[in-house]
């Protein structure tokens, strides 16, 4: 409810300043699907086959995520797109800050449909925080994402709520996961590798700058294609 739309909102605002265009009010709505048993096993859950976990809402996570149903999410975005097409926008950019598979699939599907069935071109921009030749583990609520939100709103990030740094963060205890978990290659001890307690404002500024550059390049390319 906070991190993902806040990051997308600021990226959209700054990209519009650089490339031109207007920014619609932020849609504070996201979706998620149930986790496959294999991912739950890779997180360290022993009873994965009998568990029902939606997104990052593991049983011990203290705050539930603000997940809407996937069909409601898609219908809501569809209606926003329909209204924007009526306003005769030639290029509509959806800046998505949430990496859930279902959310990205729905947005990509709608972008393809509207680009082919209406006069508008719709593209989906997702923040790529790595520079050319750089490999980063974005993860969920790990160092990268925490650094980003520290850069955007450091006053509302309280890392002191975590245990001391020498205490490992088990995937089963927190709504935190490295990319390697979703790739089927979890850490041997099933604990967080890219620790959010290592997050800094400076790193967040660097990641944000990379994401902004990538999105602006994507928008510029779409503009150029429309003019061709």
What are these regions (language model features)?
Residues 1-93, 97-228:
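Extended, histidine- and acidic-residue-enriched regions that form the cofactor-binding/catalytic faces
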């Amino acid at each position: 409810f906070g991190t993902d739309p806040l990051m997308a909102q600021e990226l959209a605002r700054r990209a519009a300043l650089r490339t031109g265009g207007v920014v619609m009010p932020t849609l504070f709505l996201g979706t998620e699907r149930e986790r496959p048993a294999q991912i739950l096993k890779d997180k360290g859950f022993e009873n994965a086959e009998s568990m029902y976990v939606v997104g990052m809402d593991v049983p011990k996570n203290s705050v539930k995520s603000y997940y809407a149903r996937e069909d409601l999410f898609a219908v809501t975005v569809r209606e926003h797109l329909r209204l924007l097409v009526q306003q005769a926008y030639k290029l509509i950019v959806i800046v998505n800050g949430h990496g859930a598979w279902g959310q990205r699939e729905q947005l990509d599907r709608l972008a393809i449909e509207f680009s082919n069935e209406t006069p508008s071109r719709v593209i989906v921009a997702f923040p790529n925080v790595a520079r050319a030749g750089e490999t980063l583990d974005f993860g969920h609520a790990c160092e990268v994402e925490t650094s980003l939100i520290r850069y955007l709103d450091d006053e509302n990030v309280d890392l002191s709520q975590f245990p001391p740094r020498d205490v490992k963060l088990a995937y089963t205890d927190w709504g935190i996961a490295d990319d390697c978990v979703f790739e089927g290659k979890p850490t041997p001890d099933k604990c967080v590798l890219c620790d959010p307690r290592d997050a800094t404002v400076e790193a967040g500024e660097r990641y944000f700058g990379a994401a902004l550059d990538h999105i602006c390049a994507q928008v510029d390319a779409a503009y150029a294609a429309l003019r061709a």
